[in-house]
């Protein structure tokens, strides 16, 4: 598998469009083909890291830059984590990709006729294309957490925990992606010996865009931690209410158990045991004790769940303000 692209009229075109006479500006190779053209040990060592790299990076090897770009899983281009190698010089960009991430990006750049002037400009445009939908994705994730927060505040502890964890994992993947890509963009923006001044400015602008996305991501991660903490607090409140009910039930049953156990011993000459109305008196005593305990617990507010009490207090506060 090999794809060749050229820059003509400041746009990217496929080599099949009448530009076969000139050397290609962009090459897409698989790992076996790239290993065949790797002329130095440093490049071969970098290519060996491609299958298991987790963070984007770039290194300067002679008169070119070599690195790996790692896109998080779940991107629109691939459901799995996408990786591709980069070999960049002033006159050529070689992309090492065993999948279709690079060919998809390059095809979209050519279809949209995105302005590019050099191989480094093509790489920068590809990275921007990877980031195109991230602002909208971060907005959707924030809307998800706002919905989770609203459900929790309404007292609904049964929310979609799977969706919450999926959003948290997505944010974690974006964090790693932004860190690595920001370092890569910073390194290339400062390499004036390899890149043209216009390309250095493009990568500097890309680095600033990543900084803005990183700050937005950081605030969103803080918000997600608050929602997770609120969710855990609601679980704790629910557990405390269950334990409160169990304590109340056990407290009500304790004197009744004592009375029934006392009369169950069947000792001679026990109070009320030999009179015809004794059973009725004992039953009435048990009912009176149970009612007295229920009234006592109700006045203390122990027979209401905490969330319900808070709701009633909020309603009373609203009525008072009215």
Identify the residue ranges that each predicted region occupies.
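Short, well-ordered turn and helix-capping elements at secondary-structure junctions
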Residues: 69-73, 192, 231, 266-269
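The cytosolic transmitter module of two-component sensor histidine kinases
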Residues: 157-160, 199, 206, 239
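Peripheral, non-transmembrane regulatory/ligand-interaction domains of membrane transport proteins
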Residues: 1-190, 196, 212, 302-308, ...
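Hydrophobic alpha-helical transmembrane segments
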Residues: 113-116, 184-204, 221-236
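A beta-strand-loop signature enriched in Asp, Gly, Thr, and Trp
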Residues: 199-202, 206-207, 213, 244
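General secondary-structure edge motif
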Residues: 121, 158, 165, 200, ...
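Hydrophobic alpha-helical transmembrane segments and their immediately adjacent juxtamembrane loops
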Residues: 211-322
């Amino acid at each position: 598998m090999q794809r060749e692209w050229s820059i003509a009229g400041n746009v990217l075109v496929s080599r099949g469009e009448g530009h076969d006479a000139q050397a290609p500006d962009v090459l897409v190779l698989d790992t076996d083909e790239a290993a065949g053209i790797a002329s130095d040990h440093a490049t071969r060592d970098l290519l060996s890291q491609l299958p298991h790299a987790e963070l984007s990076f770039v290194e300067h090897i002679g008169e070119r830059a070599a690195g790996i770009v790692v896109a998080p899983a779940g991107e629109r281009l691939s459901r799995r984590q996408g990786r591709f190698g980069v070999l960049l010089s002033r006159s050529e960009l070689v992309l090492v990709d065993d999948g279709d991430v690079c060919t998809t990006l390059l095809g979209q750049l050519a279809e949209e006729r995105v302005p590019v002037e050099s191989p480094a400009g093509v790489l920068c445009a590809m990275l921007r294309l990877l980031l195109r939908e991230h602002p909208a994705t971060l907005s959707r994730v924030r809307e998800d957490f706002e919905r989770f927060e609203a459900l929790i505040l309404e007292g609904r502890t049964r929310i979609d925990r799977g969706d919450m964890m999926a959003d948290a994992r997505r944010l974690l993947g974006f964090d790693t992606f932004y860190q690595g890509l920001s370092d890569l963009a910073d390194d290339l923006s400062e390499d004036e010996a390899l890149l043209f001044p216009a390309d250095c400015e493009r990568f500097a602008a890309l680095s600033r865009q990543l900084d803005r996305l990183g700050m937005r991501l950081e605030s969103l991660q803080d918000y997600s931690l608050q929602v997770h903490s609120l969710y855990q607090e609601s679980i704790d409140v629910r557990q405390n209410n269950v334990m409160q009910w169990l304590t109340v039930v056990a407290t009500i049953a304790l004197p009744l158990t004592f009375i029934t156990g006392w009369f169950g011993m069947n000792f001679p000459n026990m109070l009320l045991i030999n009179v015809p109305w004794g059973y009725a008196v004992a039953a009435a005593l048990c009912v009176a004790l149970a009612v007295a305990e229920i009234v006592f617990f109700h006045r203390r507010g122990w027979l209401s769940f905490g969330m319900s009490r808070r709701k009633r207090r909020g309603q009373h506060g609203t009525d008072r303000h009215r």
